[in-house]
Regions:
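NAD(P)+-binding Rossmann beta1-loop-alpha1 motif at the extreme N-terminus of oxidoreductases
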Residues: 1-51, 58-61, 87
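Rossmann-like NAD(P)(H) cofactor-binding subdomain of soluble oxidoreductases
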Residues: 53, 64-67, 71-133
Length: 133
């Protein structure tokens, strides 16, 4: 499967690593160009000290990485979920599965992250949630 993980924090990076190690073609998106280049150059995320990133992982700061993806994992901070979802809505292929892994509710609307993603993408894609304790 072709998978884009949006958000290169500790959670997004850990999920990207696991997905890549399980044989998927994974691209890890970072909001900042410099951060993306640093991950690629060092093979490490400073948020996960001592953990080597898999050689097969791809890095980008371009949201076009979602085009043609079978799955898009939304691992951005909650304050950036709506904006990111709105920006990718027109780039998604029919049938793309959106996975919400961001915690929290939106200030003002009190919507869950999965509800924001569904609303921002026009309710045209399946949205699932992965959460923990």
């Amino acid at each position: 499967m072709k998978i884009a993980v949006l958000g290169s924090g500790g959670w997004g990076t850990a999920l990207a690593m696991l997905l890549e190690e399980n044989g998927h073609q994974v691209t890890l998106w970072s909001y900042l160009e410099q951060e993306s280049k640093q991950l690629q150059a060092t093979g490490e995320n400073p948020l996960l000290p001592g953990v080597k990133l898999p050689a097969g992982l791809s890095y980008t700061w371009d949201l076009d990485c979602v085009a043609g993806s079978d799955v898009v994992v939304m691992a951005t901070p909650s304050f950036g979920v709506r904006s990111t979802a709105e920006q990718i809505a027109g780039r998604l292929s029919p049938g793309t599965i959106l996975v919400s892994v961001s915690k929290g509710i939106e200030k003002g609307t009190f919507l869950r992250m999965s509800q924001i993603i569904r609303e921002a993408t026009g309710d045209r894609f399946p949205v699932v949630t992965l959460s923990g304790p």
